[in-house]
Regions:
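Long, low-complexity, highly charged intrinsically disordered regions
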Residues: 1-50, 63, 67, 71, ...
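Amphipathic alpha-helical protein-protein interaction segments
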Residues: 8, 23-27, 44, 59, ...
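Alpha-helical cores of eukaryotic small-GTPase signaling modules
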Residues: 61-98
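Extended alpha-helical scaffolding segments
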Residues: 93, 101-215
Length: 272
């Protein structure tokens, strides 16, 4: 089963057959299946939409799988959000976009996911207000985890029952952006723009997302889309599970150098 899940190509026939097989044997497969899917999401992140679609199809037939998967994702997020190495921080971002996709296929409550994204940006704003030494790199990273997940479900969420929460997330991000310093680390500047000015990676990301929001065009070629057939079938929240509160741990960073080393700035919005 593990190899079949790993090599699932996302085609309608393969997803339909695999999800039926998994649902039929869920009484004995649940824990293993959840573990396999979580492993695939973190190790093969480019196929995240494929695994989200698979999870949605299995959940529609065996809701206990969806409940266990959401709980596993929440626990993994709490662990990685406080991770001290690059691998854990990457997984936090990957798991966040997986949750966003799960919300579009009826596995997890959409409002719960929007609340989680909002809590990341709120935590960033709280750090900015605190003014503790070295606050900005971690605050930027928390907001980055939330905002960089939006292209993976922005088109759906912006038109869903969570449209207001979606807009509020942008408002919160704008409020945070006004509290942060532009390019606080001179050594982390990216290439100068054509007019010779420095481009701040966080503001660049916000500008790109703002353009997608204004144009209503969230399609990104590098993100494989979930088949429209499945999106229509799975968009209902009838079997969606509560995410619960995701704890965002505080850190013990006490200086700018340590913070910048642990949470380096990004040069562009990366989605893959």
């Amino acid at each position: 089963m593990r190899d079949v899940i790993i090599h699932c190509d996302g085609s309608a026939d393969v997803l339909g057959g695999l999800s039926s097989d998994m649902a039929r044997d869920m009484d004995v497969l649940c824990d293993s299946a959840v573990g396999f899917v979580m492993e695939c999401v973190t190790e093969l992140p480019v196929k995240t939409p494929v695994y989200a679609a698979l999870a949605g199809l299995v959940n529609s037939k065996a809701s206990e799988f969806g409940a266990a998967l959401v709980d596993a994702a929440r626990q993994a997020l709490e662990e990685t959000l406080n991770g001290e190495d690059v691998t854990q921080r990457t997984r936090a971002r990957v798991l966040t976009r997986f949750l966003v996709l799960l919300s579009t296929v009826g596995v997890v409550q959409r409002r719960d996911v929007m609340a989680y994204l909002g809590s990341l940006v709120q935590a960033s704003t709280a750090l900015a207000r605190s003014g503790v030494a070295g606050w900005q790199p971690r605050a930027d990273w928390l907001a980055y985890v939330a905002l960089s997940a939006l292209p993976w479900g922005g088109e759906f969420l912006s038109k869903s029952e969570c449209a207001n929460e979606f807009e509020e997330l942008f408002d919160a991000a704008d409020a945070y952006a006004k509290k942060r310093s532009t390019n606080p680390d001179a050594g982390a500047h990216i290439m100068n723009s054509t007019d010779g000015s420095d481009t701040d990676w966080f503001l660049d990301m916000c500008a790109r997302l703002g353009a997608a929001r204004t144009d209503g065009s969230w399609h990104i070629a590098s993100i494989p889309a979930i088949d429209d057939q499945f999106m229509e079938e799975l968009s209902s929240t009838a079997n969606a599970h509560a995410l619960g509160s995701v704890t965002i741990p505080e850190t013990d960073i006490t200086n700018q150098a340590e913070s910048a080393a642990r949470y380096p700035g990004r040069s562009m919005l990366r989605c893959v």
